[in-house]
Amino acid sequence: MYAIIKTGGKQLKVEEGQSVFVEKLNVAEGEKVTFDQVLFVGGESTKVGSPVVEGASVAGTVEKQGKQKKITTFKYKAKKNQHTKTGHRQPYTKVMIDSINA
């Protein structure tokens, strides 16, 4: 059984026992988290939401909080001796999917 959930402005296809990286959640490591915005549930029978499936949820456990690799941007204007170098590390949360309730 699999589901498509919406979290952090993104849609993710998840299955039970799978680890997924989502946008940062304010939850401590080891705590349970529930995703209520389930857009689609597939498997033996499919359920399509409009926009969400009523009564469906996905439960998971937070494994890790961290930051992704650094992304460097460089802005440059020719002949003006003007340049800017900046970096950014996007925070993420790693979640182990425990169950899909549909």
Swiss-Prot record:
Described purpose of this protein according to its UniProt entry: This protein binds to 23S rRNA in the presence of protein L20.
Record key words, sorted: Ribonucleoprotein, Ribosomal protein, RNA-binding, rRNA-binding
Residues in coiled coil: none
Name the UniProt record assigns to this protein: Large ribosomal subunit protein bL21
Record bears the keyword Protein transport: no
GO biological process: translation
Domain of life the protein comes from: Bacteria
NCBIfam families for this protein: L21
Bilayer-crossing regions: none
Molecular function terms, GO-annotated: rRNA binding; structural constituent of ribosome
Entry-linked PROSITE patterns: RIBOSOMAL_L21 (PS01169)
Cellular-component GO terms for this entry: cytoplasm; ribonucleoprotein complex; ribosome
Subunit-structure text: Part of the 50S ribosomal subunit. Contacts protein L20.
Protein family according to the UniProt entry: Belongs to the bacterial ribosomal protein bL21 family.
Gene from which this protein is expressed: rplU
